[in-house]
């Protein structure tokens, strides 16, 4: 049961967290480039 529950929770979580981190790092790079 845990094997079925874990991926069910991890997939959407990673699918939301990973793009959020990517967008955050991208926006930080853009801000640094604009300031410099």
Curated annotation (Swiss-Prot):
**Biological role:** May help in the organization of the PsaL subunit.
Q: What is the originating organism of this protein? A: Liriodendron tulipifera (Tuliptree)
Topology versus the membrane, per the UniProt entry?
A: Single-pass membrane protein
Q: Name one GO biological process term.
A: photosynthesis
One protein family per Pfam: PSI_8
* Descriptive protein name: Photosystem I reaction center subunit VIII
Question: Which cell locations does it reside in?
Answer: Plastid, Chloroplast thylakoid membrane
Which keywords does this Swiss-Prot/TrEMBL entry list?
Answer: Chloroplast, Membrane, Photosynthesis, Photosystem I, Plastid, Thylakoid, Transmembrane, Transmembrane helix
What PANTHER family does the annotation carry? Answer: PHOTOSYSTEM I REACTION CENTER SUBUNIT VIII (PTHR35775:SF2), PTHR35775
The GO cellular component terms are: chloroplast thylakoid membrane; photosystem I
- Its transmembrane ranges are 6-26
SUPFAM superfamilies, per this entry? Answer: Subunit VIII of photosystem I reaction centre, PsaI
Q: Which family does it belong to?
A: Belongs to the PsaI family.
